[in-house]
Amino acid sequence: MSTVASAVQVLLSSCPDEQTARGIADALVAEHLAACVTILPGAQSVYRWRGQVERAAEHVLLIKAPAATYPMLERRLLELHPYDVPELLVLPVHGGYLEYLRWLEAVDD
């Protein structure tokens, strides 16, 4: 794994609707917590919640960000997200196109 790759991360979160997804994406990018957020509409989630199997249409966020912003990014996402327990998973980046990784890492520039 390259040093640049280990300095960036991809985060996964799901939102109940487009308005929420756009609001979170806009805030994370505007506040320099993420370099890019891709909104994937049309996801169907099946999960267990409070003893029941639930189904929901959701919008998935793929958040690309420097690893150093994670604590602030998590705090901000939790402030903006309407779910009691929002999904927020950090996926390790083991490699990628070097120029793209450098761009992700330089979110503050």
Predicted regions and their residues:
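Positively charged, small/polar-rich N-terminal and surface patches that mediate targeting and assembly
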Residues: 1-109
